[in-house]
Amino acid sequence: MTTALLTHPDCLKHVTPPGHPEQVARLERVLVALEPMDLLRTAAPLAVEDDLLRIHPQSHLDSLRAALPAAGYAGLDGDTFLSPGSLEAAYRGAGAAVKAVDMVISGAVQNAFCAIRPPGHHAESETPMGFCLLGNAALAAKHALDHHGLDRVAVVDFDVHHGNGTQELLYDEGRVLLIASQQMPLWPGSGGIDETGVFDTVVNMPLAPGSGGVAMRRAYEAQAFPRLEAFQPELIIISAGFDAHHADPLAGLNWSTDDFRWLTMRLCALAGGLCKGRVV
């Protein structure tokens, strides 16, 4: 089984203010950890605007470009910042998502991992927020559907915060099954079980603070995995956030490292039976 690793040094050009929780060092440490692994290392291309326009209007792209500072930082809100290299980093991240889908669907690799930043699952169609500028996971799903002609794609989003942006971008897309687990109550306040999408293809699994990995595993076994099997996706996209870890200070789901391993391996195993192992 071949796994592609898509990343680019430009993703390190998105610089946040001192003390910000989403910082360059996060990606640097991931890349160091991946160095000894046998992966097909692939440079993430810059996303082209025709691809980005599948999920964002031109006005969103223009407003990001207009807000770029010549030096220092530009605050878009209390959490979300731009530095001079932020847009280039974001376009590399989005390009990685598109390229990963291309590689997996073509059969060049079995699956792919995008080590990118800034993150994306809070970015709505016209609003950057929560550290996020572009909706990478939603873009990957739309690219698989509209460019490659797939009929059904699943997106699984695990994070301590709900992926409100991915949900907004895919809420009326009946060809995508979106499954999301998140701590509730917690910012951004969305992700309740009553948010099911226009075509009943959104599954939210809110988890209580401190509930830990046992509650997560029960939720996925009882709700997520049966829905995936019923939906029969041709590709599974994992939108992975690791702030549910017990060592992360921002919230309190208290997952262990093994919980993340278990969930990823279970999703890959399901993909083996459902969609030829195709996972991004």
Regions found by a protein language model. Give the residues of each.
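HDAC/HDAC-like amidohydrolase catalytic core signature
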Residues: 1-156, 161-280
